[in-house]
């Protein structure tokens, strides 16, 4: 019977050791699982934050792009309207009544000592301008106004209606735009 007691003692010790090893293993498994869950939660949280940030950045880029496109379209409409205003202005200047056209041409010639200059005009204004100036240079392809040039051609002052309209328009484009579009 002593052998049975030894066997039972060994079995009891073995069961105790197995139970102890199982308990340690379960604790180790629980610790590893807990750490894995924590890391998974951290990774998930980080990835969600990255995804949220990426989505917000994408939305900002898309909004910025859409706003830029809208401003471009708006600018194109403004340019078209301003061009229509410029064309109407040129049309109005082209169709000035004869007396107003002649008065404007005289005003354009006032600052110059015409005996030392050649003056060019449109074909329409040829008779009037040639009667005003001692050195008529001929006609140019302009809608109206005059071009004054030194006799040697080194200095030229372009007072054609097209150039005056362009210069006035360029100088006043901000004001015109503000009046038209607020």
From Swiss-Prot:
A Gene Ontology biological process in which this protein takes part is: proton motive force-driven plasma membrane ATP synthesis
Gene3D superfamilies noted in UniProt: F1F0 ATP synthase subunit B, membrane domain (1.20.5.620)
- Report membrane topology: Peripheral membrane protein
Pfam families noted in UniProt: vATP-synt_E
What does the UniProt keyword field contain?
ATP synthesis, Cell membrane, Hydrogen ion transport, Ion transport, Membrane, Transport
Entry's Gene Ontology molecular function annotations? ATP binding; proton-transporting ATP synthase activity, rotational mechanism; proton-transporting ATPase activity, rotational mechanism
Record-level GO cellular component terms: plasma membrane; proton-transporting two-sector ATPase complex, catalytic domain
**Where would you find this protein in the cell?**
Cell membrane
Q: Which InterPro entries match?
A: ATPase_V1_Esu (IPR002842)
Top-level taxon of the source organism:
Archaea
So what does this one do?
Component of the A-type ATP synthase that produces ATP from ADP in the presence of a proton gradient across the membrane.
Query: Which family does the UniProt entry place this protein in?
Result: Belongs to the V-ATPase E subunit family.
Q: Please describe the quaternary structure of this protein.
A: Has multiple subunits with at least A(3), B(3), C, D, E, F, H, I and proteolipid K(x).
- The protein here is known as A-type ATP synthase subunit E
Species assigned in the record: Methanothrix thermoacetophila (strain DSM 6194 / JCM 14653 / NBRC 101360 / PT) (Methanosaeta thermophila)
């Amino acid at each position: 019977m002593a052998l049975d007691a030894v066997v039972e003692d060994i079995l009891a010790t073995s069961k105790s050791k197995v139970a102890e090893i199982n308990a340690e293993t379960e604790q180790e498994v629980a610790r590893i699982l807990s750490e894995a869950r924590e890391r998974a939660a951290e990774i998930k949280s980080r990835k969600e934050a990255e995804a949220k940030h990426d989505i917000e950045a994408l939305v900002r880029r898309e909004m910025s792009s859409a706003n830029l496109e809208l401003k471009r379209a708006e600018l194109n409409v403004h340019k078209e309207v301003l061009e229509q205003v410029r064309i109407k202005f040129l049309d109005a200047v082209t169709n000035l009544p004869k007396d107003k056209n002649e008065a404007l041409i005289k005003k354009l010639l006032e600052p110059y000592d015409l005996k030392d200059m050649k003056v060019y005009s449109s074909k329409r204004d040829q008779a009037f301008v040639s009667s005003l100036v001692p050195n008529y240079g001929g006609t140019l392809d302009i809608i109206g106004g005059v071009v004054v040039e030194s006799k040697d051609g080194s200095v030229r002052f372009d007072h054609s209606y097209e150039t005056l309209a362009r210069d006035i328009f360029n100088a006043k484009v901000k004001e015109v735009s503000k009046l038209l579009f607020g």
